């Protein structure tokens, strides 16, 4: 093969073997490799890591060396032995003690998303999510499927907490929200975004509105230091009365649903919203031609595999919001994974 053919073949193999890279990351997190190395007083050899994570020495060595190639670990040789330690990347994002840890998100992706993606061809053929085929759970009620057990619900909520620990600040500072003293985070889970709002806009008060099971889990498993300013209310935002607010936040909510349900929800928010109030939509925005960014395209395909929705362009969101009655549409690409849209009543 010529050089261009070689390059094309290597690219093909990179794509075909990409799932192996994901599984290395998932497995190392699942086994606790990065936590073990973070807690150790110094670099550890294969035997020590294998003993610490209760795994075979052979398998552990293979996993550690691949993590080195992926720049997740560093290795040094002393006396003919290899000793491993975390890189800055793994220390920041792959240890559970880090404030920017993404371990729960990666575990959720490995246990749930990855398995659903095994049915991608069926999802494309049928145009629907694959919870029934993957887990035997009917998906007529989307979040009944997503929250199919208490453990799965907690895992998903922890994953979202981690997403906003990294991405919350960029989307909440895309616009000056200090003009909205009373906020409501619809579908706000365990309140990670609400906490970030408190730190950025200490004069505001915020209500997290979510279904009863989520509110119960939030109160049981997550800690709060701003109880006097963050209020949890139970309800279904598709049918129950919405809390009064100057600003309604929808973060990673609309992408779960088809246009019809999005329109229904936005109309309910518009009718409840005070005159001059607003709505902040936080999503990963597609380019107008829908051919990028690649990560957002992949997220949109994930919406097919796991939800009823899709990722959308700014124009698509403008249409949904204006049809519900909102005006003064603005959007900002943050340069991070998630972007922000603000509209007013």
From Swiss-Prot:
Variant or mutagenesis effect after changing residue 269 to M: Reduced enzyme activity
The protein's annotated pathway: Aromatic compound metabolism; melatonin biosynthesis; melatonin from serotonin: step 1/2
Q: What is the effect of changing residue 243 to L?
A: Reduced enzyme activity
The record's GO molecular-function terms, alphabetically, read: acetylserotonin O-methyltransferase activity; identical protein binding; O-methyltransferase activity; protein homodimerization activity; S-methyltransferase activity
> So what does mutating residue 305 to M actually do?
Found in a patient with bipolar disorder; uncertain significance; reduced enzyme activity
Q: What is its EC number?
A: 2.1.1.4
Inducing stimuli: By all-trans-, 9-cis- and 13-cis-retinoic acid and by serum treatment, following starvation, in the retinoblastoma cell line Y79.
Tell me the impact of changing residue 210 to G.
Nearly abolishes enzyme activity
- What top-level branch of life does the organism fall under? Eukaryota
The impact of changing residue 61 to Q is: Reduced enzyme activity
Q: What class of enzyme is it?
A: transferase
The record's section on SUPFAM superfamilies has: S-adenosyl-L-methionine-dependent methyltransferases, Winged helix' DNA-binding domain
Q: What is the effect of changing residue 278 to A?
A: Reduced enzyme activity
Q: What is the effect of changing residue 288 to D?
A: No effect on enzyme activity
Is the keyword Methyltransferase assigned to this protein?
yes
Q: Per UniProt, what does mutating residue 171 to M do?
A: Nearly abolishes enzyme activity
Reported impact of residue 111 to K:
No effect on enzyme activity
* Residue sites binding substrate per the record: 256, 302, 306
Can you tell me which family this protein belongs to?
Belongs to the class I-like SAM-binding methyltransferase superfamily. Cation-independent O-methyltransferase family.
State the remark under miscellaneous. Answer: The gene coding for this protein is located in the pseudoautosomal region 1 (PAR1) of X and Y chromosomes.
Which PANTHER family does this UniProt record tie to the protein?
A: O-METHYLTRANSFERASE CICE (PTHR43712:SF2), PUTATIVE (AFU_ORTHOLOGUE AFUA_4G14580)-RELATED (PTHR43712)
Q: How does it assemble?
A: Homodimer.
Q: What is this protein called?
A: Acetylserotonin O-methyltransferase
Organism field:
Homo sapiens
Q: What is the lineage of its organism?
A: Eukaryota, Metazoa, Chordata, Craniata, Vertebrata
